Swiss-Prot record:
One of its GO terms (cellular component) is plasma membrane. It catalyses: UDP-4-deoxy-4-formamido-beta-L-arabinose + di-trans,octa-cis-undecaprenyl phosphate = 4-deoxy-4-formamido-alpha-L-arabinopyranosyl di-trans,octa-cis-undecaprenyl phosphate + UDP. This is Undecaprenyl-phosphate 4-deoxy-4-formamido-L-arabinose transferase. The keyword Protease does not apply. It is a multi-pass membrane protein.
Length: 326
């Protein structure tokens, strides 16, 4: 068994987008939780182009004397996972913990994550106990988790919970990946050797609404499908073969029925032919849409634009980049 590397410093990365109401409690509770650790710590909050006063509040927190807060300000909104990657580029700890800013997952769970990670795990995931979300969000999350488990082979039960802990070598591996669309829990598990999950508390959102609208959830599902696997492309070939064979057999059946039952019967078959035709056309459009998703991602990757651009870092540590490395 390999030697377990000690954790000498803990970094907490929190993406923030229009969370000015929850920030005071978030800073207070996260700092209090980190003070329970035996290791030094830093709290990196990434403002993802907020339109409220979140950026100013983060800057003020980072500028306080003796503050362990680092404020990373992005020039616009790039999305939750890109913001977390920007935070990863600033960390100096041996263990990195991610946390949402809405306080649905309590920061008080941080010491537990550190304790479990000290047992030698590369990734410590979490499962939300008594999840306080709508039926729709729970159902969508359940479907997405099933898809991810089948694609990755990692039997983790709650990929949607961002309260997670990663060893430093996992962070370095993720920073060396330059695909434009990134889902961090999945990407981390592709590099992790030892993973585990623990149950954590989950509270109702106290301030504001979820930043994931229905359209964003749909986009997330497409991102997951196309960034996880090429299986949909293979399925297109299978579906195409099945549809073509079914069409051929149906054509043979219609010809046989016409020969047996006479031309009078065939008049009603026109509508059947139209229905079959529209079915085939619909299948073609679905296939074209999936191909378009993959081609669009290839185009985005070929342009090689940064996933984010950091406008300002307050409390900046030396030798950290303000732009994603290529």
């Amino acid at each position: 068994m390999s030697r377990v590397e000690p954790i000498k410093k803990v970094s907490v990365v929190i993406p923030v987008y229009n969370e000015q109401e929850s920030l005071p409690a978030l800073l207070e509770r996260t700092t209090a939780a980190c003070k329970q650790l035996t290791q030094p710590y830093e709290i990196i909050l990434v403002d993802d182009g907020s339109s409220d006063n979140s950026a100013d509040m983060l800057t003020a927190a980072a500028e306080q004397p003796g503050s362990c807060v680092i404020a990373v300000l992005l020039n616009r909104n790039y999305g939750q996972h890109s913001a977390i990657m920007a935070g990863f580029n600033q960390v100096s700890g041996d263990l990195v913990i991610t946390l949402d800013a809405d306080l649905q997952n309590p920061p008080e769970e941080i010491p537990r994550l550190v304790k479990v990670a000290e047992e030698g795990y590369d990734v410590v995931g979490t499962v939300r106990a008594n999840r306080q979300d709508s039926w729709f969000r729970k159902s969508a999350s359940r479907i997405i988790n099933m898809m991810i488990q089948r694609a990755t082979g990692k039997s983790m039960g709650d990929y949607g919970c961002m309260l997670r802990a990663y060893r430093r070598h996992i962070i370095e591996a993720m920073l060396n990946c330059h695909e434009r669309s990134t889902f961090i829990p999945i990407l981390a598990n592709t590099f992790a050797r030892r993973t585990t999950e623990i149950e954590v508390l989950h509270a109702e959102r106290e301030f504001g609404d979820s930043k994931y609208s229905l359209m964003k959830l749909i986009n997330l599902m497409y991102d997951l499908i196309t960034c996880l696997t090429t299986t949909p492309l293979r399925l297109l070939s299978v579906v195409g073969s099945v549809v073509a064979l079914s069409g051929f057999l149906l054509a043979v059946l219609l010809i046989a029925l016409r020969l047996i039952m006479g031309p009078e019967w065939s008049g009603g078959g026109v509508f059947t032919l139209f229905a079959v035709l529209f079915t085939f056309i619909g299948a073609q459009f679905v296939g074209m849409g999936l191909l378009g998703e993959y081609i669009g991602r290839i185009y985005t990757d070929v342009r090689a634009r940064p996933r984010y651009f950091v406008q300002k870092v307050v409390g900046e540590q030396p030798n950290h980049n303000t732009q994603e490395e290529e």
